From Swiss-Prot:
The keyword Ribosomal protein applies. The gene is rpmJ2. HAMAP family: Ribosomal_bL36. This is Large ribosomal subunit protein bL36B. SUPFAM superfamilies: Ribosomal protein L36. One of its GO terms (biological process) is translation. One of its GO terms (molecular function) is structural constituent of ribosome. Belongs to the bacterial ribosomal protein bL36 family.
Length: 40
């Protein structure tokens, strides 16, 4: 999982969804499981 300051480019990728867990914002992708990132 990468830690990025901006998730805007990652949420454009097909199959990705933005999830908020414990006050942090994550991008997860079921189609491409390598595409994971946390904002911070």
């Amino acid at each position: 999982m990468k830690v990025r300051t901006s998730l805007r480019s990652l949420k454009q990728i097909p199959g990705s969804q933005v999830v908020r867990r414990r006050g942090k914002t994550y991008v997860i992708n079921k189609k491409n499981p390598r595409m994971k990132a946390r904002q911070g």
